[in-house]
């Protein structure tokens, strides 16, 4: 049974840590609406940080940083998992990230994570993952 989590309005880091923990525990997880997840903070600072990550290194040698919102979320989750060990490799195989809602998951009930809601923010400034991706040049 796949647990479907709706990423709409959820904080990126809190969503990622919750998904990572559950995947390591053996759950199959699908995150839909990844482009609607939010990153808290000043818009210019957040976009500057992601631009710097994207421009690091060289095209040939890396490090390679994604542009698409589903790939950015998966990379964030990967940072919270021991992805080079067998346990982490298996956990990463149990995670699926989608932009929007795919047809095969549209009929299933979605979960949300109350601890990860943007309503918890004291400071209302935030940027959606879709806006970051568009800024980086993604065409999703």
Swiss-Prot record:
InterPro entries: Ribosomal_uL13 (IPR005822), Ribosomal_uL13_bac-type (IPR005823), Ribosomal_uL13_euk/arc (IPR005755), Ribosomal_uL13_sf (IPR036899)
Gene Ontology MF terms in the entry: mRNA binding; structural constituent of ribosome
GO biological process entries: negative regulation of translation; translation
GO CC annotations on file: cytosolic large ribosomal subunit
Pfam families per record: Ribosomal_L13 (PF00572)
UniProt keyword annotations, A-Z: Ribonucleoprotein, Ribosomal protein
Gene3D superfamilies, A to Z: Ribosomal protein L13
Complex and partners: Part of the 50S ribosomal subunit.
Free-text function comment from the UniProt entry: This protein is one of the early assembly proteins of the 50S ribosomal subunit, although it is not seen to bind rRNA by itself. It is important during the early stages of 50S assembly.
Recorded family membership: Belongs to the universal ribosomal protein uL13 family.
UniProt protein name: Large ribosomal subunit protein uL13
Originating species: Methanospirillum hungatei JF-1 (strain ATCC 27890 / DSM 864 / NBRC 100397 / JF-1)
């Amino acid at each position: 049974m796949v647990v479907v989590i709706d990423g709409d309005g959820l904080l990126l880091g809190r969503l990622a840590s919750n998904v990572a923990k559950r995947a390591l525990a053996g759950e199959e997880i699908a995150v839909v609406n990844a482009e609607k997840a939010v990153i808290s903070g000043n818009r210019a600072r957040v976009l500057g940080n992601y631009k710097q990550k994207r421009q690091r290194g060289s095209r040939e040698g890396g490090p390679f940083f994604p542009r698409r919102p589903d790939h950015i979320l998966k990379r964030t989750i990967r940072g919270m998992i021991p992805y080079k060990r067998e346990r982490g490799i298996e956990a990463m195989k149990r995670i699926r990230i989608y932009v929007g809602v795919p047809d095969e998951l549209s009929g299933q009930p979605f979960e949300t994570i109350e601890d990860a809601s943007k309503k918890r923010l004291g400071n209302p400034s935030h940027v959606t993952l879709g806006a970051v991706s568009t800024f980086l040049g993604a065409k999703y």
